[in-house]
Amino acid sequence: MSTTETTGKSPAKVETGVKLRGAEKVARIPVKVIPTEELPRKPDWIRVRMPASPEVERIKQLLRQHKLHSVCEEASCPNLGECFAGGTATFMIMGDICTRRCPFCDVGHGRPNPLDPDEPKNLAVAVADLRLKYVVITSVDRDDLRDGGAQHFADCLREIRRLSPGTQLETLVPDYRGRMEIALDITAAEPPDVFNHNLETVPRLYKASRPGADFEWSLDLLEAFKKRVPAVPTKSGLMLGLGETDEEVIEVMKRMREHEIDMLTLGQYLQPSRNHLAVQRFVHPDTFAWFAEEGERMGFKNVTSGPLVRSSYHADQQAHGAKGD
């Protein structure tokens, strides 16, 4: 019996700065997650070795030193070892507590702390210390902010460019739900080199997998940015294995091209825990290759498609391919 049933009171509000994960995180979403008895056995093609190299530890220590978060760690990315060992990282700004409860994601939910005004400078110093040539900046959703965090993104870009003018910058932004105009006005004034926003899955699965988000809104966000800053490539991605069909994936790819999205990533969804959405299928590498061929035929400037692909995986190579470098 729930606390509400026994006391007649609503559950207490989560205190600011408290991070909910797993079952606590997804307890109040509209379509309930049924915990799986055990995680599915992964096929051979998506098993990865997590190297514990000195370079990985050095980057982790540097992130802690500058009070920064990497999405590589927070989202339990399977490529963490490869990317960290290669001296790269995708930075997650605006804290590590998200205002959304997406049941596929391993980032914690709650009431976020106020923005750290020193974060843009700390991030810029870390990028300079690591001598990075290509940086991806993403964030948690911040529905508590008037601009959804767009100004904080812009401040981070500006500070990095001041210390590392040769570094290319890609932003992987939230959907700015209800804040599109103000967020894009700010973004257009300090645009990234690549503007990325993930659709994540097909429209039919949005209610179960992206509560609080809207498929058409996300498409419109990408198109609206493109109209403001035509020279900057736009990018989006899908996770496969949530219950979509191949035909639905192709249809979403067509919709992306109709909205002038330049770059596409497709990867396998991996269930972070028993309390997250269950994997419905493991897509074979040959199918990922077929999607890439179809995407190239549709006119995407770059398609990166494979079981271990994530939005920021080899992002520098994707961007160079899109720009014809």
Swiss-Prot record:
It is an enzyme of class 2 (transferase). Its EC number is 2.8.1.8. [4Fe-4S] cluster 2 binds at C98, C102, C105. It holds the Pfam family Radical_SAM. [4Fe-4S] cluster 1 binds at C72, C77, C83, S312. The keyword Amino-acid biosynthesis does not apply. The keyword Transcription does not apply. Pathway: Protein modification; protein lipoylation via endogenous pathway; protein N(6)-(lipoyl)lysine from octanoyl-[acyl-carrier-protein]: step 2/2. Binds 2 [4Fe-4S] clusters per subunit. One cluster is coordinated with 3 cysteines and an exchangeable S-adenosyl-L-methionine. Residues 84-301 form the Radical SAM core domain. It catalyses: [[Fe-S] cluster scaffold protein carrying a second [4Fe-4S](2+) cluster] + N(6)-octanoyl-L-lysyl-[protein] + 2 oxidized [2Fe-2S]-[ferredoxin] + 2 S-adenosyl-L-methionine + 4 H(+) = [[Fe-S] cluster scaffold protein] + N(6)-[(R)-dihydrolipoyl]-L-lysyl-[protein] + 4 Fe(3+) + 2 hydrogen sulfide + 2 5'-deoxyadenosine + 2 L-methionine + 2 reduced [2Fe-2S]-[ferredoxin]. It is found in: Cytoplasm. Keywords: 4Fe-4S, Cytoplasm, Iron, Iron-sulfur, Metal-binding, S-adenosyl-L-methionine, Transferase. It comes from the Bacteria. HAMAP family: Lipoyl_synth. Belongs to the radical SAM superfamily. Lipoyl synthase family. This is Lipoyl synthase.
